[in-house]
From Swiss-Prot:
Protein name in the entry: Ribosome-binding factor A
Subcellular location: Cytoplasm
Protein's job: One of several proteins that assist in the late maturation steps of the functional core of the 30S ribosomal subunit. Associates with free 30S ribosomal subunits (but not with 30S subunits that are part of 70S ribosomes or polysomes). Required for efficient processing of 16S rRNA. May interact with the 5'-terminal helix region of 16S rRNA.
Summary of subunit composition and partner proteins: Monomer. Binds 30S ribosomal subunits, but not 50S ribosomal subunits or 70S ribosomes.
Main location: cytoplasm
UniProt keywords, alphabetically: Cytoplasm, Ribosome biogenesis
Superkingdom of origin organism: Bacteria
SUPFAM superfamilies, sorted: Ribosome-binding factor A, RbfA
Gene3D superfamilies: 3.30.300.20
Amino acid sequence: MNQRLQRLADQIQRELAVLIRDAVNDPRLTGFVTISSIKVSPDLGYADVYVTIMEPELNDAMTMSNHEESIKVLNKAAGFLRTELSHSLKTRTTPRLRFHYDEVTARGNYMMDLISKAVIKTEENESDEQENEE
């Protein structure tokens, strides 16, 4: 991605984060929406927005159906968000927004949980071995 597209993607990310937080009032969107990254097409026709959604009431353990519902809500609000975004962008056209669930972040969190469990198990085994030696 060239520098111009990257600057535009960064600006869209900043503006969208505020718009989603303040302007999207859909009750089905209950978690905290975090924009992981944005990829803008070279012709500025589309912007693929990758988001993660954290649900504090569920201890961040949202199911895939929860994520799909949240992505549907965001995609339905994409036209409104695009219109609002066009007021702050200094481009002739505003890219169409397509929201996607960012599985990379979720996969990273899953791997961190596995590592934490492995470390705890290793520490337990080491303490058991020390007790057996005594």
